[in-house]
From Swiss-Prot:
Residues 125-280 are annotated as: Nucleotide-binding (NBD). The modification N6-acetyllysine is found at residues 125, 213, 271, 326, 353. Belongs to the heat shock protein 70 family. The interdomain linker regulates the chaperone activity by mediating the formation of homooligomers. Homooligomers are formed by engagement of the interdomain linker of one HSPA5/BiP molecule as a typical substrate of an adjacent HSPA5/BiP molecule. HSPA5/BiP oligomerization inactivates participating HSPA5/BiP protomers. HSPA5/BiP oligomers probably act as reservoirs to store HSPA5/BiP molecules when they are not needed by the cell. When the levels of unfolded proteins rise, cells can rapidly break up these oligomers to make active monomers. Keywords: Acetylation, ATP-binding, Chaperone, Cytoplasm, Endoplasmic reticulum, Hydrolase, Isopeptide bond, Methylation, Nitration, Nucleotide-binding, Phosphoprotein, Signal, Ubl conjugation. It is found in: Endoplasmic reticulum lumen; Melanosome; Cytoplasm; Cell surface. InterPro entries: ATPase_NBD, BIP_NBD, Heat_shock_70_CS, HSP70_C_sf, HSP70_peptide-bd_sf, Hsp_70_fam. GO terms for cellular component: cell surface; COP9 signalosome; cytoplasm; cytosol; dendritic shaft; endoplasmic reticulum; endoplasmic reticulum chaperone complex; endoplasmic reticulum lumen. This is Endoplasmic reticulum chaperone BiP. Monomer and homooligomer; homooligomerization via the interdomain linker inactivates the chaperone activity and acts as a storage of HSPA5/BiP molecules. Interacts with DNAJC1 (via J domain). Component of an EIF2 complex at least composed of CELF1/CUGBP1, CALR, CALR3, EIF2S1, EIF2S2, HSP90B1 and HSPA5. Part of a large chaperone multiprotein complex comprising DNAJB11, HSP90B1, HSPA5, HYOU, PDIA2, PDIA4, PDIA6, PPIB, SDF2L1, UGGT1 and very small amounts of ERP29, but not, or at very low levels, CALR nor CANX. Interacts with TMEM132A and TRIM21.
Length: 654
């Protein structure tokens, strides 16, 4: 009898377990979607990490645009935005500004003045009226337009995963009220998605940076400057529990406004040059808008950008340059105005600047260097968290949340996985480890530095890539080596070699070296499993590094002192040999005295590479005692002040 009871219990257990499995199976892979005003983004938690998914155009962010062509075709995303210039009345965007609001809402009345498509009142709500081709007009609720964008994101995820997606986590601004949240959920339902959670965008961004994993209570300021909106939120996190303490911002400030300022500038400039007013040609204005947006993006990484438009207006071409300085000047008042909501949020939460533990930048417009500078200055030099693309951070956090809801066990330590566990760098003269990426930097990340040659007419530099915490490469772990050849003959320290380290989300390191003079390049790719360390080795190395820190410091000082003497001697040698500089101003006796002293020190260096710090310092002092009286004499006769250090610009040598 006992046996049957046990068997029944087992059966029951199996049935419950199977039911749980079924339940989990029903959910499938849950995706995280950032449904933005101007752009949307989708991510998924897969194989223990977040993947942000590129759309069919290869873009990781998709314009929140829907268009209806005269032929009756419906376009969503990039395709819709691309034909905005030719079909502005039937291209719908900014639906997020209308969703969940009533027709009489003052912000709706303000918005519809600026939208190129028609917004009408229906059931006390704003509806969008468009021509869907074949002479037919149709009205859509904002939820339906948002649903079309969500469908596009859902299809993007399905194409990547190779299976149906039915469940999602969708983000909304922290200030969205219940009606707006419910309307967003409804948009999901229309798109065939079960929206399991609606989470606040700033919370999602904080989760993306793993800030929910920190011990104790933390204050986090999220600065979110997107395409059309600006939101500042102050969150507190206490052991994984988030609370939005205060929010502020400007629902009408973002990248589009910066574009508008630049456009107005060029429209005025064009009128001044040609006497023609472009404003009345909708298509020309939209063409300009598209090119200005491209130029603005380019200016986040370069100092000027060209804007070229063929047959811009009445058959005439348009060609102008926009510099970063001009872009900043045109928008400076808007950039500065972003600080007021930050101040307000601090006041509302009763906190001082120094109480903020983390600053998180979100939204594509936070890539603008001036914005980053203003935020950093406001917080007295405190650096914001970095490492996740600002336009992907919200979707990233939504995907983490989605992973938890999918029942993925791996989400536990997620964000700890996504850092670079050890410092990465290259070997420079004297076996010194020159750091490019410090340990615990969140990946993906990219860092560049300029180096130079260590000897005259050096045709090749060898780039040795190491990981580890010790100041000297011999104590660190060699990851790979490659050569950059074909460097044209030049004195030491003259060639400029830019070394770039880039780690992608999969922890794959790419190191590139480029001779800035010739454009000559070479690179190496280092993957996780190739030659990498185990977590135990990493831990041991970090502990060792602390133990050895003191002796390492002494050794590095010795090498630095030697390098100082060497640089001083070679710099003098070059100047004495240059008739344009010191060489042309010295008397023959003085020249001979200096040449002899310099040669003597160079020879001594070659045979005493391992001398003590004191020896190197003494030799440098001896040389200075010979050189300085001669140079002082020159000063007396009005010569220019050549110092021994003149040409040694601050570049490490390879």
């Amino acid at each position: 009898m006992k046996f049957t009871v046990v068997a029944a219990a087992l059966l029951l257990l199996c049935a419950v377990r199977a039911e749980e499995e079924d339940k989990k199976e029903d959910v499938g892979t849950v995706v995280g979607i950032d449904l933005g005003t101007t752009y949307s983004c989708v991510g998924v938690f897969k194989n223990g990490r977040v993947e942000i998914i590129a759309n069919d155009q290869g873009n990781r962010i998709t314009p929140s645009y829907v268009a209806f062509t005269p032929e009756g075709e419906r376009l969503i995303g990039d395709a819709a935005k691309n034909q905005l210039t030719s079909n502005p009345e039937n291209t719908v965007f900014d639906a997020k500004r209308l969703i969940g609001r009533t027709w009489n809402d003052p912000s709706v009345q303000q918005d519809i003045k600026f939208l190129p498509f028609k917004v009408v009142e229906k059931k006390t709500k704003p509806y969008i009226q468009v021509d869907i081709g074949g002479g037919q007009t149709k009205t859509f609720a904002p939820e339906e337009i948002s649903a079309m964008v969500l469908t596009k994101m859902k299809e993007t995820a399905e194409a990547y995963l190779g299976k149906k997606v039915t469940h999602a986590v969708v983000t909304v601004p922290a200030y969205f009220n219940d009606a707006q949240r419910q309307a967003t959920k409804d948009a999901g339902t229309i798109a065939g998605l079960n929206v399991m959670r609606i989470i606040n965008e700033p919370t999602a961004a904080a989760i993306a940076y793993g800030l929910d994993k920190r011990e104790g209570e933390k204050n986090i300021l999220v600065f979110d400057l997107g395409g059309g909106t600006f939101d500042v939120s102050l969150l507190t996190i206490d052991n994984g529990v988030f609370e939005v303490v205060a929010t502020n911002g400007d629902t009408h400030l973002g990248g589009e406004d910066f574009d508008q300022r630049v456009m107005e500038h060029f429209i005025k400039l064009y009128k001044k040059k040609t006497g023609k007013d472009v404003r009345k040609d909708n298509r020309a204005v939209q063409k300009l808008r598209r090119e200005v947006e491209k130029a603005k993006r380019a200016l986040s990484s370069q100092h000027q950008a060209r804007i070229e438009i063929e047959s811009f207006f009445e058959g005439e071409d348009f060609s102008e340059t926009l510099t970063r300085a001009k872009f900043e000047e045109l928008n400076m008042d808007l950039f500065r105005s972003t600080m007021k909501p930050v101040q307000k949020v601090l006041e509302d939460s009763d906190l001082k600047k120094s109480d903020i533990d983390e600053i998180v930048l979100v939204g594509g417009s936070t890539r603008i260097p001036k914005i980053q500078q203003l935020v950093k200055e406001f917080f007295n030099g405190k650096e914001p968290s970095r490492g996740i693309n600002p336009d992907e951070a919200v979707a990233y956090g939504a995907a983490v949340q989605a992973g938890v809801l999918s029942g993925d066990q791996d989400t536990g330590d997620l964000v700890l996985l996504d850092v670079c566990p050890l410092t990465l760098g290259i070997e420079t003269v004297g076996g010194v480890m020159t750091k490019l990426i410090p340990r615990n930097t969140v990946v993906p990340t990219k860092k560049s530095q300029i180096f130079s040659t260590a000897s005259d007419n050096q045709p090749t530099v060898t780039i040795k890539v190491y990981e580890g915490e010790r100041p000297l490469t011999k104590d660190n772990h060699l990851l790979g080596t490659f050569d950059l050849t074909g460097i044209p003959p030049a004195p030491r320290g003259v060639p400029q070699i830019e070394v770039t380290f880039e780690i992608d989300v999969n922890g794959i390191l790419r190191v590139t070296a480029e001779d800035k003079g010739t454009g000559n390049k070479n690179k190496i790719t280092i993957t996780n499993d190739q030659n990498r360390l185990t977590p135990e080795e990493i831990e041991r190395m970090v502990n060792d590094a602390e133990k050895f820190a003191e002796e390492d410091k002494k050794l590095k000082e010795r090498i630095d002192t030697r390098n100082e003497l060497e640089s001083y001697a070679y710099s003098l040698k070059n100047q004495i040999g240059d008739k344009e500089k010191l060489g042309g101003k010295l008397s023959p006796e003085d020249k001979e005295t200096m040449e002899k002293a310099v040669e003597e020190k160079i020879e001594w260096l070659e045979s005493h590479q391992d001398a003590d710090i004191e020896d190197f310092k003494a030799k440098k002092k001896e040389l200075e005692e010979i050189v300085q009286p001669i140079i002082s004499k020159l000063y007396g006769s009005g010569g220019p002040p050549p110092t021994g250090e003149e040409d040694t610009s601050e570049k490490d040598e390879l």
